[in-house]
């Protein structure tokens, strides 16, 4: 999300293709306070220079010449040689789905630990890790979901191997970006720091941008489990992986079309099941089966789904299947404000 000192993004910013979103001054100030190192500084997606204007002598890189500030290098960040090294890398990397990343950037970003499920901001993180000198710091604002995203598992393992996230500010539901999703986090990573000690702050519903001037810090332990990054209050000798494994549910990409009491052929545990205990009757399509009659009128919409490549031979299939097993399980409603997101249910199908 390339940066600027304004809050409202103008219409000429390329949000979908380039991930261009303005960085509010309160965010910039908070992130600048996390800088500890002296030495060479890089802002890899500098936009109009929200950070760069406070960092004399820093190298700024911006792919869009319309917004590059004076002195910035107008280039694709992934063209920067890995032989470069920086004491501090700071900024707001672009949030772009893989399918929307330009072909040129895709080619340049090949050969990383990531794959075609990864958002562009994850490729930025991976590239920055290679550019950090020993003891170097990476200070970013990103979606917080990388901590537990399946697409980020190899990157998270690499980060944990290389160092520690020394500061992490969960911004909660603060709407700091116009026309952009909340659920972001500000964090600082230090290469070579293996203390596993993290200063952690979580902003609540009543907090405002002013809270960033003095975050409510607490001490946490930085852990990695199954490629997921955690900030825990204690060390836990028993890991979830010792007694269970985690699987994610199916994704249709069009629940309103696949949900049908009349044409459905399988009951699914869904996000509302935790509240009412009810399952959802849905149209399930096994690979190799012909398209269900109920979906034929919706072919044009279904083939245009972007969760995976669709053609004339598979347009009726779900975007992602689910692990089929009769093993006992505990369901977790992953995106909820419920204090108790865990529940059990006899149904073994889940989305």
Q: What are the residue ranges of the model-derived segments?
A:
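Long recognition/docking surfaces used for binding and targeting
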Residues: 1-7
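Signature of N6-adenine DNA methyltransferases within the class I
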Residues: 8-32, 45-70, 77-252
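Sterically constrained small-residue positions within well-ordered secondary structures
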Residues: 35, 178-180, 322-323, 348
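Proline-centric
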Residues: 35, 80-81, 128-132, 193, ...
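Short, hydrophobic beta-strand segments that form beta-sheet elements in well-ordered domains
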Residues: 39-45, 56-63, 268-269, 331-332
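Residue-level preference for the first positions of well-ordered beta-strands
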Residues: 40-41, 88, 137, 329-331
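Polybasic, glycine- and aromatic-enriched phosphate-binding surface used to engage nucleic acids
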Residues: 229-351
């Amino acid at each position: 999300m390339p940066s600027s000192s304004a809050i409202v993004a103008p219409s000429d910013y390329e949000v979908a293709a380039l991930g261009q979103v303005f960085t509010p001054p309160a965010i910039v100030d908070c992130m600048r306070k996390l800088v500890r190192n002296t030495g060479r500084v890089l802002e890899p997606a500098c936009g109009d220079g929200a950070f760069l204007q406070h960092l004399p002598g820093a190298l700024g890189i911006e792919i869009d010449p319309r917004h590059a500030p004076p002195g910035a290098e107008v280039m694709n960040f992934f063209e920067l040689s890995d032989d470069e090294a920086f004491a501090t890398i700071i900024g707001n990397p672009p949030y772009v789905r893989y399918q929307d990343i330009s072909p040129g950037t895709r080619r340049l970003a090949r050969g990383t630990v990531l794959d075609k499920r990864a958002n562009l901001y994850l490729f930025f993180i991976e590239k920055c890790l290679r550019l950090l000198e020993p003891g170097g710091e990476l200070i970013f604002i990103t979606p917080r979901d990388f901590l537990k995203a399946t697409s980020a598992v190899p990157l998270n393992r690499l980060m944990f191997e290389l160092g520690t996230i020394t500061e992490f500010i969960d911004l909660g539901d603060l709407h700091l970006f116009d026309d952009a999703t909340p659920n972001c986090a500000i964090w600082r990573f230090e290469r070579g720091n293996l203390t596993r000690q993290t200063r952690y702050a979580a902003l609540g519903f009543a907090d405002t941008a002013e809270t960033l001037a003095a975050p409510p810090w607490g001490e946490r332990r930085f852990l990695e489990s199954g490629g997921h990054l955690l900030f825990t209050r204690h060390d836990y000798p028993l890991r979830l992986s010792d007694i269970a494994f985690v699987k994610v549910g199916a994704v249709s990409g069009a629940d309103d079309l696949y949900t049908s009491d009349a044409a459905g052929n399988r009951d699914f545990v869904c996000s509302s099941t935790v509240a009412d205990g009810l399952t959802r009757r849905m149209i399930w399509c096994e690979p190799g089966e012909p398209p269900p009659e109920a979906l034929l009128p919706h072919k044009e919409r279904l083939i245009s789904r972007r969760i995976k490549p669709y053609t004339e031979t598979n347009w009726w299939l779900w975007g992602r299947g689910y692990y089929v097993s009769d093993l006992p399980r505990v369901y977790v409603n992953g995106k909820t404000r419920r204090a108790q997101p865990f529940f059990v249910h006899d149904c073994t199908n889940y989305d």
